């Protein structure tokens, strides 16, 4: 009985370590992509760390239930990284940007929108036995490409609520 309990504990512990390793690997892969293109012409990068997220949350005025949900979501976010490329036509980073979701572990496509050559994809990764989740949004338009990567302790439904609230949050 002790042996079985020990095996179960070891399995749970190893899953926790693997989940944390997947998150670290994903973060490193996306950070390397940001670093590669950070000083490139026509590319803007925005990185919002935990301290700035707290400042944003502290500056919000809560007036209703939606605002309370937004505040809870903001408190659960650890970081937001955004890359925007403004350039007409296809760019050299488009293919590489859309490969990120395949290179990163655990990302699941949760929604994809395609219309007249424009594409928007949403990916979500939740790591077993870890409170860290990742959200990746990739957008390709005729004159712009956008990558948004959010990490924190949230769920798919939290991200859905964020989308429903739209510009009312930030």
Predicted regions and their residues:
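Early exported N-terminus immediately downstream of N-terminal targeting peptides
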Residues: 23-93, 97
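A short, solvent-exposed beta-edge/loop patch
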Residues: 123-156
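Bacterial Sec-dependent N-terminal signal peptides
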Residues: 1-24
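Short Gly/Thr-rich strand-loop-strand
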Residues: 98-126
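Short helix C-cap/helix-to-loop transition motifs enriched in small/turn-promoting residues
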Residues: 90-91, 102-107, 131
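Terminal interaction module
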Residues: 83, 92, 124, 135, ...
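C-terminal partner/receptor-binding element of secreted or periplasmic proteins
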Residues: 30, 152-170
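Extracytoplasmic
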Residues: 40-43, 75-79, 104, 115-119, ...
């Amino acid at each position: 009985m002790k042996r079985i309990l020990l095996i179960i504990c070891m399995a749970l512990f190893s899953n926790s370590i693997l989940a944390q390793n997947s998150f670290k690997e994903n973060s490193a892969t996306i950070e390397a992509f940001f670093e590669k293109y950070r000083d490139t012409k026509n590319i803007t990068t925005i990185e919002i760390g935990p301290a700035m997220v707290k400042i944003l949350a502290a500056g919000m005025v809560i007036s209703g239930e939606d605002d309370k949900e937004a505040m809870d979501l903001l408190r659960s976010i650890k970081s937001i990284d955004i890359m925007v490329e403004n350039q007409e036509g296809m760019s050299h980073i488009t293919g590489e940007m859309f490969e990120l979701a395949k290179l990163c572990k655990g990302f699941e496509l949760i929604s994809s929108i395609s219309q007249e050559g424009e594409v928007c994809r949403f990916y979500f990764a939740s790591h077993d036995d870890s409170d860290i989740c990742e959200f990746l949004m990739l957008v390709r338009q005729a004159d712009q490409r956008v990558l948004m990567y959010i990490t924190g302790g949230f769920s798919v439904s939290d991200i859905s609520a964020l989308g429903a609230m739209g510009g009312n949050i930030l």
